[in-house]
Amino acid sequence: EYLQEKKVPFVTIGSSNYTGVIQIDHNHKSACKELTSIILMKGMKRIALIGGDENHVVTQSRLRGFREAYEKMGEVIDPTMLFLNLDNHVVIDKIVEEVLERKAECILCMDDAVCSRVLKKLREKHVKVPKDIRVASFYNSSVLENNVPSITSLSFDAKELGMVACKTVLDVIEGAEVETRTLLPY
């Protein structure tokens, strides 16, 4: 708000609920819809979704994609397999145990940090991925890239995000018309 009041040119990297703010982000909703659809097409029905703060715009976008995939595939989400607002390792560990008791076929993690913790807990319990349970993530990072076995995850190009944001803010400074929201591919 301060930057807008002072007419300082800026863009946000990531999505925001602020109106009139130029946003550059990846298309999280579409990416998560596609990954969830693929998992459903592989015949998995008992999918647990584990994630963080649902007040975050990125979590909301990813959740919309997840829901849209179920709708597109004509499937019904089991609300007892949705676990959001998990904010610490202890809670995530407890949820992993609960998901295993509920015989989930796949754990779908909202991001790499959650996924990393899920994998650690599965290793501690001697649960084999993908033999005993499948694991996928809505966000990839170096944390997951080196995991053995590899984890199916969505990759977003952070370098491209920065370059597009830089070009956009330069265009704003030069007075050019720019889109208020730019969604990049995955």
Regions found by a protein language model. Name each.
Residues Q4-Y186:
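Bacterial carbohydrate/catabolite-sensing allosteric modules
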